[in-house]
């Protein structure tokens, strides 16, 4: 770096060369050089930090712990930063997730940028990163506060995606409510059901998943702000944190609260852990649904081919005309990633040694990743797979007629063992069930036709569609 391209600033360790036009200061520059690898700190975290710092500045002024002119200068600088688009905002926030596990460097990145910009906009006030922007706070309570805020924000985006998929499935459920097909257990033929009934199971699973998320989400409304370094609240002005919670609630539209045990808030992240457990459950259900759809669509000539899937793109670079269930594959890969993220979060949440957990940055990065990929793949699955999905009724009828497990309908009339022998005979001799049943002498043709009612076997009249 040539002389004209950098400036020298000092922190408590010593002088640091910093790019001349950078708004950040020495601690950010040290981190930039010390931790250059991995994904960048999510901008959701940065924006949450900015909202938190603004709320803190306003609150400190209101309780008399910050001069009004300094507080207003900090607020003004933050408003300028919040107005930037993501590309421009990123220029001043270059740090990575893999840094100190407390997120200290990212907290200081925000403090330094806000202070330097405030001094540019309001010369002469001498605003300092630690003494003014970080007043009454520490990385130990600000970073976990932003973690919960952005987690709630991410869930707010995921929930509509789940509802949208439910809506698309309900449309298909109603359309195919009385379309009878072969049921399958252990990947083997089983008794009939309707495709609508099968879809109702998917819908119910997603409704349960949505309710788990919604019921657990309020645990994330408990904010650690005010705990400062170890949970005692040292250096936080009385009344400041309650005001911060109120201001953040207005910004995000959720009832955040600070009346919680701060020692828990700094050393534990069980709220994020348990909520991510619900995301893992959603991912597991999505894997099952996507797997079912792609298997039922297998073929078209040498598979089940009960379902016709939309042709969204060419499926092969060598096999002409091939159509693949790509949206389902994206869902299953996303689910695999969520399972891995859950393991990361579970382990990282256990690392709250003494008064602070130092795996914070990787916990929230994994949580946000899960929310993002679930939101995207669920939306794509709804719009580009389920919406255009149709049933191959002719193929369903063919497989149903060839199934041996419809013999179950005869069991109440002729007994389990006699019915089993009919199925075994049909399979061994390659005949239809009806032929084997009549040959057994246990059933007349009239009885067979009466009892072998596929629709009646589904108990459709006792089933209720999911809405």
Name what the model sees in each region.
Residues 1-467:
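Conserved, well-structured ligand/cofactor-binding cores
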């Amino acid at each position: 770096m040539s002389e004209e391209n950098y400036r020298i600033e000092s922190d408590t360790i010593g002088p640091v060369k910093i790019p001349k036009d950078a708004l950040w200061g020495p601690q950010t520059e040290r981190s930039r050089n010390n931790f250059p690898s991995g994904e960048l700190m999510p901008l959701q975290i940065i924006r949450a930090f900015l909202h938190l710092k603004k709320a803190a500045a306003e609150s400190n002024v209101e309780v008399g712990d910050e001069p009004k002119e300094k507080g207003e200068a900090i607020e003004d600088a933050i408003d300028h930063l919040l107005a930037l688009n993501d590309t421009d905002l990123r220029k001043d926030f270059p740090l990575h997730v893999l840094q100190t596990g407390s997120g200290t460097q990212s907290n200081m990145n925000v403090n330094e940028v806000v202070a330097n910009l405030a001094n540019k906009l309001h010369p002469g006030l001498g605003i300092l990163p630690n003494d003014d922007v970080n007043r009454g706070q520490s990385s130990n309570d600000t970073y976990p506060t932003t973690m919960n805020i952005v987690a709630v924000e991410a869930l707010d985006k995921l929930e509509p995606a789940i509802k949208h998929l439910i809506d698309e499935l309900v449309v298909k459920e109603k359309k195919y409510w009385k379309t009878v097909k072969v049921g399958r257990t252990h990947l083997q033929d089983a008794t009939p059901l309707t495709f609508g009934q099968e879809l109702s199971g998917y819908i119910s699973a997603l409704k349960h998943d949505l309710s788990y998320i919604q019921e657990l989400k309020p645990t994330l409304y408990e904010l650690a702000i005010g705990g400062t370094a170890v949970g005692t609240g040292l250096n936080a002005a009385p009344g400041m944190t309650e005001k911060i919670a109120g201001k953040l609630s207005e910004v995000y539209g959720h009832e955040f609260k600070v009346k919680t045990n701060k020692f828990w808030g700094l050393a534990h992240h069980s709220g994020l852990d348990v909520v991510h457990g619900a995301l893992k459950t959603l991912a597991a259900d999505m894997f099952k649904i996507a797997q079912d759809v792609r298997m039922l669509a297998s073929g078209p000539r040498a598979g089940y081919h009960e379902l016709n899937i939309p042709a969204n793109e060419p499926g092969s670079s060598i096999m002409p005309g091939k159509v693949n269930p790509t949206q389902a594959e994206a869902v299953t890969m996303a689910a695999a990633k969520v399972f891995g993220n859950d393991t990361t979060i579970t382990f990282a949440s256990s690392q709250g040694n003494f008064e602070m957990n130092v795996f914070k940055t990787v916990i929230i990065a994994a949580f946000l990743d899960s929310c993002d990929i679930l939101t995207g793949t669920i939306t794509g699955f709804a719009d580009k797979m389920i919406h255009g999905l149709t049933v191959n009724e002719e193929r369903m009828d063919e497989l149903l007629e060839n199934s041996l497990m419809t013999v179950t309908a005869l069991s109440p009339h002729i007994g389990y063992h006699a019915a089993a022998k009919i199925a075994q005979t049909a399979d061994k001799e390659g005949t239809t069930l009806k032929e084997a049943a009549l040959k057994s002498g246990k059933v007349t043709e009239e009885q067979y036709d009466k009892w072998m009612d596929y629709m009646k076997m589904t108990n459709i009249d006792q089933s209720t569609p999911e809405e």
